[in-house]
Structure formats: structure tokens, C-alpha cells
Amino acid sequence: MTKMIFVNLPVTDLKTSIAFYKALGFEQNPQFSDDTAACMVWSEAIYAMILTHAKWRTFTDRPFPPAGTSEVMLSLALDSRDAVDAMNAAALAHGGQADVNPVQELGFMYSRDLADPDGHLWGAFWMDPAAIPHADPG
């Protein structure tokens, strides 16, 4: 079986969150979606399960983190700097926040961080591995 990751995120408005994630480039998998949850596909190995609070409670009784706090930031590699900028623009246009952290311009890597409507953090980045500076072994 292929190794996959399913990131489970509690959301306050499932329809708003579905529209938000579609705008970022995720596709909805209807086979694993209903009126309490939606499976949003980033790639063959990466999925975001957006869950109503009631559905989330079927998995855990742990409290929801307050908006504006974070325990993880999920980062997605994109094909270009323009794609990074487009993802942040889409986040802003669909109820999220763009540039929640300072933009990073490192020459070989460009990143901008965003938040979904519930405050979950996502990093969008582009990197040119051939341009990564290498330490002098001597």
C-alpha cells in the first residue's frame, strides 16, 4: 500500500472550507465526503480531511485550539513562485489570510504562509534544489 498522510482539520463551516480548499488547488473526493466531512486531495499521497466540529468530536475530546494559535504548519511545494503568489491570492479571496508570516526570499527558495478560514496554517513554497548553497567541506 502507498504511504499516505491524511491531515484532519476541524472547521466551523464545511461549505466555506470546501470552497476555500478548492480555490487553493485541492480536489474533493466525493467517495469520502458527506455533510460532516470532506476529503480534499492535494496529491496521490496527501489529503486534508476537513471535519465539522461534531465529526471531529467522534475522534477526540481534546479542545479545539483557539484561532490565532497553532500546533503545526503544513507546507506544500509548488511548481513556481507565481504559483506561490497565486495560492496566497486565492486564500485571501476565499476567506483566508495571506502572508500570516513574513515572506521568505532566499534565492533558492521562496515561501509565503497563509491561514484557512479557521486559522489553520499552510506554507506555500517554491524551491530550486540546484541553487541551494552548499557548505564548503574544507
Stretch-by-stretch model annotation:
Residues 4-12, 40-41, 62-138:
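Vicinal oxygen chelate
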Residues 1-18, 73-76, 127-138:
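N-terminal beta-strand motif that seeds the catalytic metal site of vicinal oxygen chelate
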Residues 8-56:
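Core segments of cupin and vicinal oxygen chelate
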Residues 17, 21, 84, 91:
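Hydrophobic pocket/interface hotspot
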